[in-house]
Amino acid sequence: MLLLQQKQTEALGTQPIGKLLLRLAAPAVAAQIINLLYNLVDRMYIGHIAPTDTVGRVALTGVGVCLPLIMIISAFAALAGQGAAPRASIYLGKGETDKAEEVLGNATSALVFLSVVLTAVFYIFAEPMLLAFGANDGTGGTDNTLLYGFEYLRLYSLGTLFVLVTLGLNTFISAQGFTVTSMLTVLIGAVCNIILDPIFIFGLDMGVRGAALATILSQAVSMIWILKFLTGKKTTIRIRLRYLKPNWSVLLPSLALGLSPFIMMATESLIAVCFNTSLRKYGVDLAVGAMTILSSVMQFSMLPLQGLTQGAQPIISYNYGAGNADRVRHAFRLQV
């Protein structure tokens, strides 16, 4: 089994680039579509919370105010995960599996540490952050979007560990060339979320808290799937206890490489905050909810590009480590 998995990873340096890019990018695009669709379904359920249409509208707006904060969680996952995964691919290209596993172990520790810090910050300061990010407390005749945003964010923050580890470590599965397995991570979480959403939101009458609980439990299932894979026999590199101890000479270069996607995602969060606060000031709370839906629809245009980038990353990193400059240039040209 191990030999088979090694051959699949080594294919990054031997198979024709065009065929390889298509094989890796197609599952990545599918994963992006699945992720977006289940987010849309999640918001559809929230928008139909009883007893009145107004409640659903205000609840959707309240959750929409939480989205910039959730983007920040994703940004930290990118800082530790997207920065470290390419370095692991480079070491695999060099044939240095132990160093690739050390990168993986340090990234895992960083993700756990960041999740503890973010959980504390989001749980303790949920209310002032939501007010700063565009929520209303119901004074002056406005809708109380803070109530729904607070309920959602406080519960969601308790699952930060599941979200960070899932987002951060799934990149290491793709980095080895196992993009189908990476896609299954997203699919498993999406199916669980779609099943649990109506049960918690409507069946147990939990409202937005039910949506948050469904999300974090789904991410927990995805995290278990990832950890089972990265500690099992089907992976080329494994999470090993001896590499969980932070080594700054390994961790800092990974964080430096992850700084770029972190800044990009943090900037998206800032833009969303600007939209929310401007819409609240010059429009009505309904406009914030409408923007929440519109932003989800707009993401469809980015899916092919994101999938292609995710498919090309392990090819470029692996061949860079192996010293195959021609294959690196070829993959880059095809991607562009």
Predicted regions and their residues:
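Residue-level hotspots within the lipid-embedded alpha helices of multi-pass solute transporters
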Residues: 32-36, 75, 115, 119, ...
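Hydrophobic transmembrane alpha-helices of multi-pass small-molecule transporters
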Residues: 72, 193-197, 223-227, 300-303
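Short runs within selected transmembrane alpha-helices of multi-pass transporters and secretion channels
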Residues: 31, 81, 156-174, 182-190, ...
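Helix-terminus/linker motif at the lipid-water interface of multi-pass membrane proteins
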Residues: 33, 37-60, 130-143, 199-205, ...
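Short alpha-helical transmembrane segments in multi-pass integral membrane proteins
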Residues: 1-28, 88-161, 203-258, 316-336
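Signature of the first transmembrane helix
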Residues: 19-85, 89, 256-279
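Small-residue-rich hydrophobic transmembrane alpha-helices
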Residues: 60-120, 163-182, 290-336
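Structural signal for membrane-spanning alpha-helices in multi-pass inner-membrane proteins
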Residues: 122, 171, 197, 201, ...
